[in-house]
């Protein structure tokens, strides 16, 4: 794997801005069949990541109860409005409300070996690729690296078969 990240990455990835409505971002992930995307500011620099893991609460079907059951006791909420605000904050209405603000980035000129090591060490599935000005220029996934490994293997074995 002597290639650089720039040679393998997906250039110009789909991105979202922090104020993007969450519903729009979810539809984008689903329609493009991707599991996550970088969140960028107006200058194109990464400020977060939105992944399907961040969105898992959607499947929970959280509702606003008037009370909470705890150890067979009923506890009535003294301030349902505050609970409602906290619930909406937790569920989020924009990308900024649910995104992960820690961005895993790698430089476009870094090696694939470094990228693979980062993904392994951090236990992540994708890296946001940035240029020298820290602007998002691509995305690199585990799948991209595995495909490159398979391609390199095929090219190395082909001369042996001839």
Region annotations inferred by a language model:
Residues 56-71, 145-160:
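A short, polar/charged loop-to-alpha-helix boundary motif
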Residues 48-51, 56, 125, 138-145:
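Short hydrophobic beta-strand motif reused across regulatory alpha/beta modules
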Residues 50-54, 58, 62, 82-85:
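N-terminal short leaders/motifs
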Residues 30-33, 54, 63, 123, ...:
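Residue-level detector of secondary-structure transition/capping positions
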Residues 1-34, 39-42, 46-47, 72-118, ...:
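Bateman/CBS regulatory modules and CBS-like beta-alpha motifs in cytosolic regions of diverse proteins
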Residues 132-140, 149-153:
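Charge-rich, low-complexity terminal tails
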Residues 120-121, 125-128, 132, 145:
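Extended hydrophobic
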Residues 104, 120-124, 151:
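Alpha-helix capping at helix-to-loop junctions
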């Amino acid at each position: 794997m002597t290639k650089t990240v720039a040679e393998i990455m997906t250039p110009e990835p789909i991105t979202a801005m922090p104020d993007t409505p969450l519903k729009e971002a979810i539809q984008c992930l689903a329609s493009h069949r991707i599991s996550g995307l970088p969140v960028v500011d107006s200058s194109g620099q990464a400020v977060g990541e939105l992944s399907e893991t961040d969105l898992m609460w959607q499947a929970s079907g959280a509702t606003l109860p008037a009370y909470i059951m705890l150890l067979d006791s009923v506890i009535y909420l003294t301030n349902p409005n505050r609970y409602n605000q906290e619930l909406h904050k937790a569920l989020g209405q924009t990308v900024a409300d649910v995104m992960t603000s820690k961005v895993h980035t790698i430089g476009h000129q870094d090696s694939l070996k470094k990228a693979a090591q980062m993904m392994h060490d951090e236990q992540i599935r994708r890296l946001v690729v940035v240029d020298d000005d820290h602007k998002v220029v691509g995305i690199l996934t585990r799948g991209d690296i595995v495909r490159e490994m398979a391609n390199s293997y095929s090219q190395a074995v082909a001369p042996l078969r001839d």
